Every structure is written in structure tokens, then in C-alpha cells.
Amino acid sequence: MVTKKELTREAEFLTTLRTILETYEEIAATRMARIRSSVLNSRDFLLEINAIFQQVKTSYKTQTELLMQTRKIKDSSKLTFIKRNGKTLYVFISANTGLYGEIIRRTYDVFVENLRKEPGDVAILGKLGMEIFNEEKIKAPLTYFEFPDNKMDNEAVQKIVEHIIKYEKVLVFYEQFNNVISQSPIVTNISGDPLPWEKGGPQAKYFFEPSLEKIMEFFEKEIFASIFQQTIFESELAKFAARMVSLDFASENTKIRLKQVIMTRQRIKHQEDNKRQLEKFASMRLWK
């Protein structure tokens, strides 16, 4: 049977734990509020930029033959301004720690589902994603990158971009913020090729200034990195929101358990008081 002393220790522990949870929840909320507006504003802008990237790349392909004739090139792969390896890369942006609820696992499930349908190389950001991937023992060429959960590391981003830009097709799997209580897994193709559900409709014809080559070079080098950086910001925002919700849930559970412990301790105290009263009355009768 649980003693009053044990219940007192548990109550003290739960009180401390609740304070810690509320503190971390407040930190997550502050960080989320700090980047929320900028991320959401950038989201719409870069979605449009990515769509333009796709259209430019499609137009570029349709004009390849003409460009090959002009430059007397027989191999079309030489028309790209970055040497690519012809492979597909799956990038999973995870986390280094827990307390993010189920969103990391849900994103991982989408990532693995796509990887199994069409095998390719893998790049993982974050220790948690690496641990999950190793546990499942999936065989795929893998590159792991250390990356912080709560800030943008520009040097690390540059290192990652230098690795992933070599691939013909780059799919990034990450967490997206919908609202404070809802986050969802999402995949973005950052290499300028539309995903299956993004295709459709007639392709517009464009005039390119100063030239098609210059514009493609700009998109392949500069816009590629910007779109990838946005996916990291999106993941960061979604994880802050998920952590806030997870900590709030844990805090409420701690509050409920603390209330139960206090009530149990009071009940034991009443039982002890009643027992002492009965013993007192019994001893008084013996003296009469």
C-alpha cells in the first residue's frame, strides 16, 4: 500500500515536473510566435517561385533541341549548368529530440512509403530520424547531416545544398504548420519537376530575358537553395507548434495526476486522524 510519505514525494515531483513542462511550453510558444509570420509569408511567395521554376524548366526542355542546334551539342545532359548524377534523392527533415508528438513519425512514414515505391538515395537531418531509419534497417545509400532543431544554421544549409544539388530529382519530406493544433507531413520537389498531382493544364510559352540559359542558371543555383531553406523553416515552425501542443497535453495529465495524489494523501491523512481518535477514545474508556 502506498504511504503518505511516498505520496508527498510524488506530489513534489509532479509539481516540479508541471512547472518545467509549462516553462518549456512557453518557450516553444515564444519561438513559434517569433517565426510564424515570416514563414507563412515566405511560404506563399516561394510556392509561386517553385511553380515558376517548374514552368521555366518545362519550357527549357521544349527548347532543348533548338539550343542544342545553336551550340552544336549532341548530349542534352550538357545543357544543365550543374553536373547532376541522374539519381533521385529523398530528404527527411526530422529532429534531434522528442516531445513533438506524432508528427515526426507521421512524416517519416510518408517518406518511407515513397522511398519503397521508387528506391533512391537518402539524406536525413536530425538524430531522431536517423535512429528510426536505422531501427527499420532499410537498405539505401544514406547521408546524415547534423542540424539544430531551434535555429537556422547557414553553414550547415550550405553543406547540405552542395550535396543535394547534384541530384536530378530532390524530394524533401518535412512537417508543415497548418494551425497551432494541426501539423501535417508534406513533400516538396525542389528540383523544378512537378509532382504527379501538380501536373495538368496547358503549358504557357515564355520569352526569356536576358536569355533562357541565364534564367535557368539562376534557378538551378539560387532558387534551389532558397526553396530548400524554406522547407527547413516550415519544419521548424511545425515542430514548435507540435511541441507546444504535446507539452500542454503532458502538463494537463500531470495536473490531473497531481490532483489524484493530493486527494489520496488527504484520504490517508483522514484515515490516520480517525484511527488516532478511535485509539484516544479507547484509551479513555480503559481509564474509567
Please state what every model-predicted region is.
Residues 1-288:
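C-terminal beta-strand-loop-alpha-helix "lid" module of Rossmann-like NAD(P)-dependent dehydrogenases
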